[in-house]
Each structure stands twice: as C-alpha cells, then as structure tokens.
Amino acid sequence: MIEFGKRATPQSAADAVRGDSGMASGMSAGAMATLAQSAASTHAYYDTTFSRRAMKVLPGEYSVTTEDLMLVTVLGSCVSACVRDKTLGIGGMNHFMLPSRNEGESILSPSMRYGTHAMEVLLNQLYKAGAKRERLEIKVFGGAAVLAGMSTLDVGERNGKFVLEFLRNEGLTVAAKDLFDVHPRKVYFVPSTGQIMVRKLRSQNSAAELDSEAQYASKLSKSITTKPASRLQLFT
C-alpha cells in the first residue's frame, strides 16, 4: 500500500448542474445521467480495516464531505481527483473516464468537454462548501491499462493525460499522482487530514468493480453527444 500523504454529499453531476441556475451543459440527458449515477448508488459503510466511517465512490460519481469521513474508490482505466481545502479540511473525490470516440485529442472535443465537466462539477461543489482555490491540495490516481479489448485505444493513458492537462490549464498544482501502470488501484482518501492510501490490486478480487467500470465505459460511448457543451463557471 502506498500512502500519500456534518455531512457527506455524494451527488450526481446532473443534479449539480440543475442546481446551478443559468448553466447549460449542452449534453444529452443520457450523457449527463451516465456522468454520475444516482446518489443512492454511492454507498456508506464502516471500514473495519481503518476503523472509520467510509463512502464508496462508484464509476461516474463524485462525493464531497465536510466530515471526518473516508472516501473510497476502485480504479481501473478511470481516474480520480482527490481534492481538499488544506485549511478547512473539507474535500471530495470523483471517478470518471473520457468516452471513446474517433476524434482528435483537442481539449474542446466532445469527449474532452465531458471530462472537463466532471472535474468542474467537483471543484464547484467544493467552492460552494467553502473551499478556496489557493488552498486546494490535489492528488490524482488511476489511468491503468486494464479494460479488456480497449488497451489498443490507450484508454487509461488518455484519461490520465487529460486530468493532468485540465489541472495545468486551470493553473492548479498536482501535489501527488499515481497514474498509468497495468494494475487496478483501490484509493482511500481522508479529506479532513489529507491522508491518501493506495493499494495496487494484483489479484482478481476487483473483478466486480472493474466490470462496473467497463459497463460505465460502454454507456458513455453510447450516450455522449457531439453537441457543444458549455463549460461550467468555476466559483472561487
């Protein structure tokens, strides 16, 4: 295991967009629904290994918490950004991938806009909770080459490069990263302290989680629209 380093609010990104009046995503309803499954599918549990209350963040979801809560996800080709306000100890995690499309890698392409949306939803929810841009600590994980039949598309590498490019374009510093490779990862993030533990999964125990990621990838490819999507405004 590698170590880096009130109320939890797991939500769908579609709900977050609907809550921001005057902001239109330009995505189809199907794409927005796929971006984050319903909040009910993000599971709260007690983690006996770490003796902590925890919340699972599944593919397409994000969660923001102001409590002493551990956020947990399993990543294959998807990526997660773990973001916290170092002063307030509030933070959040997302779990997403870019839809596969036969297009250029421009940051303005439809699938790249989809990734931008996933990142901006998380950041906006943190800003609304009181986080400040200048106090953000950001660590990113995932992007492994693990999805069967998709390795030739460099899905994981594409996702990892996207999140790094997004943060660079936004002028946000990456404090730590663990990207690419061929092994799935289980990420444990405690926003209140900034502690992150990453376990590389080298067995088949993560098959169920990776199956859900593959299903998520399939839905993305079918639901993403080529209609231009507006960037969300970042509130700082």
UniProtKB/Swiss-Prot annotation:
TM helices/strands, residue ranges: none
Keywords: Chemotaxis, Hydrolase
Keyword Calcium: no
Keyword hit for Hydrolase: yes
GO biological process, one term: chemotaxis
Coiled coil ranges: none
Catalysed transformations (reactions): L-glutaminyl-[protein] + H2O = L-glutamyl-[protein] + NH4(+)
Entry's EC annotation: 3.5.1.44
Source taxon at top rank: Bacteria
First-level EC class: hydrolase
Cross-referenced InterPro entries: CheD-like_sf, Chemorcpt_Glu_NH3ase_CheD, Cytotoxic_necrot_fac-like_cat
PANTHER family: CHEMORECEPTOR GLUTAMINE DEAMIDASE CHED-RELATED (PTHR35147:SF2)
Sequence similarity: Belongs to the CheD family.
NCBIfam families (UniProt xref): PRK13487.1
The protein, known as: Probable chemoreceptor glutamine deamidase CheD
